[in-house]
Swiss-Prot record:
Residue ranges constituting the FBD domain according to the UniProt record: 349-401
Membrane-crossing segments per the record: none
SMART domains linked to this entry: FBOX
Superkingdom of origin: Eukaryota
Pfam families to which the protein is assigned, alphabetical: F-box, FBD, LRR_At5g56370
Coiled-coil blocks: none
CDD domains, per the entry: F-box_AtFBL13-like
Protein name: Putative FBD-associated F-box protein At5g56690
Organism of origin: Arabidopsis thaliana (Mouse-ear cress)
Residue ranges constituting the F-box domain according to the UniProt record: 1-47
């Protein structure tokens, strides 16, 4: 003990940073030297699931834990809190608890704040000081309520915003919050039912990465996206009713990851500039693929389709025809998990007459990978036959059999 206590305080603080916050605080009883060291930790994490070791489900244990945070968090002395994470699973906070802890973090120029409320959504981010925090760079909320005050707000440094299972005070809360973030670069929204939103408006000129996940039960109103600087777009949409995406021009978009059950092709008009496209959609259709003729993906280099049904090759073959510079094609076959959906394979023209070969087969396709190949499926065999017969530039091939 004497040897480690002889180390400089700065080094001891770095050592304490490797410990859970509650354990680091407990070292304050070791000696006078250790009494205040934990107060200079740059990162703090309070999580009742990890920290409550006795009587996890008891009201008294959670009350003791609340008191522990209320006592120790205000004692923190570092001028900047690099990150503060608050996670609650087994008890109910009072509104003033979370509000006071957030205000302490803001007063210490917090840079990253995470609030995770498992199983409950009665914790409101209503502290007015939070919405004017100049130091905040990252804000993450899970299962909380966003209550934006009517006063003038600004988050001038916020670059990352993650909102999962969040409930909003009203229809304007999210729009107002986004309008306070002039330099926001990454936005992730995961929607579930009862979030008090109908449509969704994302109007953030500075945004570079956008991730939208919508589950069954969410409203089916339109999504409006105005993000001219966007580089990456993810849309996972499992809503039961048909909805549309209205997207302003995104000329800098380079990568898209799409999993939409209905009309995913409607988005293709926005993807003319992308280099990487991942598609997890229902390919099964006896009709012609539904995106507009004349759309060409001149910059697309990597294509990853996830296959659920028969007749997947119809849309894929058209995408290949419209992607003259494609270098990497990786097919992930998950049909075995969707046997109830699989329809009858209807051979398309290329399986009968291979005279029309995609340009990328002749000039650019270098890598071809298949995960879970079904040798008993005629459609799979037809497509592989086409690839190996005409893809002249292949350098790498990988096929995993189911």
């Amino acid at each position: 003990m004497a040897e480690i206590s002889g180390l400089p305080d700065d080094l001891l603080v770095k050592i304490l940073a490797f410990l859970p916050t509650k354990v680091a605080i407990s070292t304050s009883v070791l000696s006078k030297q250790w009494r205040f060291l934990w107060m200079w930790l740059p990162k703090l994490k309070y999580d009742d699931y990890d920290d409550i070791t006795d009587g996890f489900n008891s009201v008294s244990a959670f009350q003791t834990y609340r008191d522990f945070i209320a006592k120790n968090l205000p004692l923190h002395r570092a001028p900047i809190i690099e990150s503060l994470s608050l996670g609650f699973r087994c008890g109910t906070l009072q509104p003033e608890d979370l509000k006071s802890w957030v205000e302490v973090a803001v007063s210490r120029s917090v840079r990253e704040l995470s609030i995770l409320a498992y199983y409950r959504n009665n914790y409101a981010l209503s502290s007015s000081s939070l919405y004017t925090c100049k130091s905040l760079v990252t804000l993450k909320g899970f299962n909380i309520r966003v209550d934006v005050p009517p006063t003038v707000c600004l988050l001038p440094s916020l670059r990352t915003l993650e909102l999962k299972r969040v409930r909003y005070l009203n229809e304007d809360s999210l729009r107002m919050l986004l309008s306070f973030c002039p330099v926001l670069e990454y936005l992730s929204i995961e929607r579930h039912d009862n979030d008090n939103l109908r449509g969704l408006v994302v109007d953030v000129p500075s945004l570079r990465r956008l991730s939208l996940t919508s589950y069954t039960g969410c409203s089916s109103d339109d999504y409006v996206i105005v993000t001219p600087s966007l580089k990456y777009f993810k849309a996972f949409d499992y809503r039961s009713e048909i909805s549309s995406y209205k997207i302003e021009k995104i000329p800098e978009l380079e990568e898209a990851d799409i999993s939409i059950e209905r009309n995913p092709e409607k988005l293709f008009v926005y993807f003319k500039s992308i280099k990487c496209l991942s598609l997890q959609v229902d390919f099964n259709s006896k009709e012609e693929p539904g995106y507009d003729s004349g759309i060409v993906f001149n910059h697309l280099e990597e294509l990853t389709p996830y296959i659920n049904d028969a007749n997947w090759s119809k849309l894929l073959f058209r995408l290949l025809n419209d992607s003259p510079k494609l270098r990497v094609l990786e097919i992930s076959n998950s049909k075995s998990f969707y046997k109830e959906k699989i329809g009858e394979y209807l051979p398309v023209s290329w399986s009968k007459n291979q005279g029309s070969v995609p340009k990328c087969f002749l000039n650019s396709l270098e890598t071809f990978r298949v995960k879970w190949y079904y040798s008993e499926e005629q459609e799979d065999r037809d497509f592989l036959s086409l690839i190996f017969k005409h893809a002249r530039c292949l350098k790498s091939t990988s096929i995993l059999h189911r």
